[in-house]
């Protein structure tokens, strides 16, 4: 089940403040996704879209229970701040995960952060995005507030996850998009908590990988590498420039 809201950018600070306060009642089955998008009614205007999704796919879960989990958001000031809203929509998990089969060139750099206001810092730069490009920018608010299982191998270095894959068409647009995206991440990176190893870090920022380890563990990995790969024949996945 899902509730969604559209907001003008001038109320975005208030929206983030409300969501921060609602973290106290956030259930681990509830996903909060706050994104910057082009207004469906006016592509020249940027708006904020909030989706609150309850994944109720366990035995015994019901629509009534899902509505109960969504109730704190419906009863907050989110509704009065929004320009439009759709409440308690029943959706299928397959539809939620569907992605159109499209081919794009891309760049991607995600961060963990404890400050949801990171989204505010990039609003003006977002408006300067190259034409015909698509930034799937989304803040997973309170991603790391669920039950933490100490026996699980799971890495999360902050309260919120900010994902920002950039998509575009044509190799002739590579330079413009990569330059714009580099500036975007220079704005975002000061908000990062520790470091999230991204899919392109080995190519673009190999030294960042070291930031993901304590100095002690980094030296252990270096020792193992020197033992089994003394001639450095393998890819420098450990972040050596």
Q: Where in the sequence are the language-model features?
A:
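Soluble FAD-dependent oxygen oxidases
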Residues: 1-241
């Amino acid at each position: 089940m899902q509730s969604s809201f559209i907001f003008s950018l001038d109320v975005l600070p208030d929206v983030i403040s409300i969501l921060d306060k609602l973290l106290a009642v956030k259930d681990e089955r509830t996903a909060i996704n706050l994104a910057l998008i082009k207004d469906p009614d006016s592509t020249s205007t940027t708006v904020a879209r909030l989706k609150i999704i309850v994944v109720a796919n366990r035995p015994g879960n019901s629509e009534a229970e899902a509505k109960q989990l969504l109730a704190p958001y419906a009863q907050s000031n989110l509704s009065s701040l929004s320009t439009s809203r759709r409440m308690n929509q029943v959706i299928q998990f397959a539809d939620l995960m569907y992605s159109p089969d499209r081919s794009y060139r891309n760049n991607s750099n995600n961060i963990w952060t404890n400050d949801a206001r990171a989204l505010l810092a990039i609003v003006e730069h977002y408006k300067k995005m190259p034409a015909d490009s698509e930034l799937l920018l989304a803040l997973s608010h309170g991603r790391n507030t669920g039950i933490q299982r100490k026996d699980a191998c799971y890495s999360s270095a902050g309260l919120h996850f900010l994902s920002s894959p950039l998509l575009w068409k044509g190799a002739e647009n590579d330079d413009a998009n990569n330059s714009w995206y580099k500036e975007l991440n220079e704005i975002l990176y000061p908000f990062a908590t520790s470091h999230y190893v991204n899919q392109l870090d080995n190519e673009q920022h190999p030294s960042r990988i070291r930031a993901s380890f304590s100095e002690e563990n980094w030296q252990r990995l270096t020792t193992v590498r020197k033992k089994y790969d003394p001639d450095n024949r393998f890819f420098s996945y450990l972040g050596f420039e």
